[in-house]
C-alpha cells in the first residue's frame, strides 16, 4: 500500500485498527509522553490526541499524532513493505545503488533496466499550488506557542519539536538534504536547531557560512508528511540519490514538492505544517537539558537559532510528535525495523557477514552484534573495523560483538554463551581510543570523542591459539528423529 500523504496513512491505520483516537483532553506537558510510553511498551496503536489542552485549560486548535512508528510493522507499512522481513529488499536496492555492479551480460543488463528506470523516473514533481500553503502566517502572526509542541520530561527546559524534517541545501549542491534534528522552543518565532557538526544540515550550513559569512541561511522545517518521506530522512540513502527521490521509489509515485514562499527550498506539497525561516550569522543559544534516547538528561551546549519568518499549513493541520527516552522508545523501534535495511548494505561490502543486529536496549546504535562465516585468523577484527567505518550510521557504535554463524545474534542467551566460551578477555578484546562518539554520550571522557570496544567471540583459528579448541556438543539426528516420533505418546 502506498500513501500520498500523512492523512492517507492515518486513514489506513485506523481502518486496520492500528490507530486510536483520544477524545479526552490531554496536555502536551508530560501527559502525552506518559500515555504514548505506556502504549508503545504494550506494542499498541498510533495515537491521535484530538483535544490537546494548553496550560490554562483551553484547547489547542490542532490534534497531535504520536506513536506513529511505535511497532516495526508500522515502520514497514510506512516504507511500502508488506512485512518487516521485506525491508531487506529495500536494503538490497540501496546496496546496489550505493555500489552498482557492472552487468554480467546483456540479459543481466536488461534485468536491471526496470529498477534504474524506476529510480530516475522518481525525480520530484514541483507544483505551483499546494495544500501545505492553504494557510499562511507571516510577521507578527507567526506564533509557535499556538502549536501543541510536546514537553516530554519533568526536567526538560522547554517544549521540544521532535519530528521536524529539516530541509537544507549546500551552496554547491542541487540535492536538498533532509534531516531530523530536535528543536527547542525559545520564543514565538525562535527555535534552537540542534544539529551535530557531522550531520548533513550542519555541513550544508558550514559550507554556506564559509562563502557567505554575513548572509542569513535559509531553512525549512516540515511537520507531518507522508511516511515514505519521513522514513527516507532516517534511511542511509546513497549520496547520489535525494531523500525525495528515494521516497518516490518507496511510494511508487513521484514526490510532489512546492517551493517555499520565502526561499528557494522545496518542501512536500501535502505536508501538514511548514516552518520557513533563516539562521542569522553568529546567533546561537544554550540548548537543553533534555531527556533523550539514552534514558538520561543530556548536558547543555550552544547551537544555532532558527528564526521562523513564516508558518504555512493545510486546513485543519495535524501536528506530528514523539518523545525519546530509555528504550524502548520510537527511535529504538525504528532501529529494529531499519536493522533489516542495514543487513544487505553491510553484506554487499562484507559478504562473510550472515546477520547484523542492533539490540534496542543499546539505544538504537550503541551496540551491534554481527555473525559471520570466519575464514582466517584475525577475520573478526576486520569485520569490526569494517562495521565502524563503512556506514555513517555506525560511527558512534561503541561496542561490536562478532560471533560465528552458528550463533543467533538476536538471542542474548546464545550471544552470552559465545562470549563466555570463545573469548579470552585480553586476547580477544579490541580497544580503540579517541574515536568519534555521540555528543550525548556523557560516559566518554571528552565530549564527542571516546573509545570503542570490539569483542571477538568467534572460534579461534591457528595463529590465534595453540590450544586444542572445544567442539560444540551436537545431538544425534537419528535419536532426535526417533524421539520426535514418539513424543506425544510419552505424554511429557
From Swiss-Prot:
- Which keywords does the record carry? Cell membrane, Decarboxylase, Flavoprotein, FMN, Lyase, Manganese, Membrane, Metal-binding, Ubiquinone biosynthesis
Q: What class of enzyme is it?
A: lyase
Q: Which reaction does it catalyse?
A: a 4-hydroxy-3-(all-trans-polyprenyl)benzoate + H(+) = a 2-(all-trans-polyprenyl)phenol + CO2
Give the cofactors, semicolon-separated. prenylated FMN; Mn(2+)
Query: Where is the protein found, in the record's own terms?
Result: Cell membrane
* Any Pfam family matching the protein: UbiD_N
GO BP: any one term: ubiquinone biosynthetic process
What stretch or stretches form a coiled coil here?
none
The record lists prenylated FMN as bound by 180-182, 194-196, 199-200
How does the record say this protein sits in the membrane?
Peripheral membrane protein
Q: Where does Mn(2+) bind?
A: 177, 243
What function does the entry list? Answer: Catalyzes the decarboxylation of 3-octaprenyl-4-hydroxy benzoate to 2-octaprenylphenol, an intermediate step in ubiquinone biosynthesis.
- Catalytic site positions: 292
**Where does the secretion signal sit in this chain?**
none
Co-factor binding comment: Binds 1 prenylated FMN per subunit.
Which GO cellular component terms, listed alphabetically, does the Swiss-Prot or TrEMBL entry include? cytoplasm; cytosol; plasma membrane
- Which molecular function terms from Gene Ontology are attached? 3-octaprenyl-4-hydroxybenzoate carboxy-lyase activity; metal ion binding
- What is the protein name stated in its UniProt record? 3-octaprenyl-4-hydroxybenzoate carboxy-lyase
Q: What is the lineage of its organism?
A: Bacteria, Pseudomonadati, Pseudomonadota, Betaproteobacteria, Neisseriales
Q: Which family does it belong to?
A: Belongs to the UbiD family.
* EC number per UniProt: 4.1.1.98
Q: In which pathway does it act?
A: Cofactor biosynthesis; ubiquinone biosynthesis
Q: What InterPro entries does the entry give?
A: UbiD, UbiD-like_C, UbiD-like_N, UbiD_bacteria, UbiD_Rift_dom
Subunit-structure text: Homohexamer.
Q: What is its main location?
A: membrane
Amino acid at each position: 500500500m502506498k500513501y500520498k500523504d500523512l492523512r492517507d496513512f492515518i486513514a489506513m491505520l485506523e481502518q486496520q485498527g492500528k490507530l486510536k483516537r483520544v477524545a479526552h483532553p490531554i496536555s502536551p506537558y508530560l501527559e502525552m509522553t506518559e500515555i504514548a510510553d505506556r502504549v508503545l511498551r504494550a506494542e499498541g496503536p498510533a495515537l491521535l490526541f484530538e483535544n490537546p489542552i494548553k496550560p490554562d485549560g483551553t484547547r489547542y486548535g490542532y490534534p497531535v499524532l504520536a506513536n506513529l512508528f511505535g511497532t516495526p510493522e508500522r515502520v514497514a507499512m510506512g516504507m511500502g513493505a508488506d512485512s518487516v522481513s521485506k525491508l531487506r529488499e529495500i536494503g538490497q536496492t540501496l546496496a546496489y545503488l550505493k555500489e552498482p555492479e557492472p552487468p554480467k551480460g546483456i540479459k543481466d543488463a536488461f534485468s536491471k533496466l526496470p529498477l534504474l528506470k524506476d529510480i530516475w523516473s522518481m525525480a520530484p514533481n514541483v507544483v505551483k499550488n499546494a495544500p501545505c500553503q492553504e494557510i499562511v502566517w507571516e510577521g507578527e502572526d507567526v506564533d509557535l506557542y499556538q502549536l501543541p509542541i510536546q514537553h516530554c520530561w519533568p526536567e526538560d527546559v522547554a517544549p521540544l519539536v521532535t519530528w521536524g524534517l529539516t530541509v537544507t541545501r549546500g551552496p554547491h549542491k542541487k540535492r536538498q538534504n533532509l534531516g531530523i534534528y530536535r528543536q527547542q522552543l525559545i520564543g514565538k518565532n525562535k527555535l534552537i536547531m540542534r544539529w551535530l557538526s557531522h550531520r548533513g544540515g550542519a555541513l550544508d550550513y558550514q559550507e554556506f557560512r564559509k562563502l557567505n559569512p554575513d548572509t542569513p541561511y535559509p531553512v525549512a522545517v516540515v511537520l507531518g508528511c507522508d511516511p515514505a518521506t519521513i522514513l527516507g530522512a532516517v534511511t542511509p540513502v546513497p549520496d547520489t540519490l535525494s531523500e525525495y527521490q528515494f521516497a518516490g521509489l518507496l511510494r511508487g509515485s513521484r514526490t510532489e514538492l512546492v517551493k517555499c514562499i520565502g526561499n528557494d527550498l522545496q518542501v512536500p506539497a501535502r505536508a501538514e505544517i511548514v516552518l520557513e525561516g533563516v539562521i542569522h550569522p553568529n546567533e546561537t543559544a544554550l540548548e537543553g537539558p533534555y531527556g533523550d534516547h539514552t534514558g538520561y538528561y543530556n548536558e547543555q551546549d550552544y547551537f544555532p537559532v532558527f528564526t521562523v519568518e513564516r508558518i504555512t499549513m493545510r486546513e485543519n493541520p495535524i501536528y506530528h510528535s514523539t518523545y525519546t527516552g530509555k528504550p524502548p522508545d520510537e527511535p529504538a523501534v525504528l532501529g529494529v525495523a531499519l536493522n533489516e535495511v542495514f543487513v544487505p548494505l553491510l553484506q554487499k561490502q562484507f559478504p562473510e557477514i550472515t546477520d547484523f543486529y542492533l539490540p534496542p536496549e543499546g539505544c538504537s546504535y550503541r551496540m551491534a552484534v554481527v555473525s559471520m562465516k570466519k575464514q582466517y585468523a584475525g577475520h573478526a577484527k576486520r569485520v569490526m573495523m569494517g562495521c565502524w567505518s563503512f556506514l555513517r550510521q555506525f560511527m558512534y557504535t561503541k561496542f561490536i560483538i562478532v560471533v560465528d554463524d552458528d550463533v543467533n545474534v538476536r538471542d542474548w542467551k546464545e550471544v552470552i554463551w559465545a562470549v563466555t566460551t570463545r573469548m579470552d578477555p585480553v586476547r580477544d578484546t579490541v580497544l580503540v581510543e579517541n574515536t568519534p562518539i555521540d555528543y550525548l554520550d556523557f560516559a566518554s571522557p571528552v565530549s564527542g570523542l571516546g573509545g570503542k570496544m570490539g569483542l571477538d567471540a568467534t572460534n579461534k583459528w591457528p595463529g590465534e591459539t595453540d590450544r586444542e579448541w572445544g567442539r560444540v556438543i551436537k545431538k544425534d539426528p537419528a535419536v532426535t528423529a526417533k524421539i520426535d516420533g514418539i513424543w506425544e505418546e510419552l505424554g511429557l
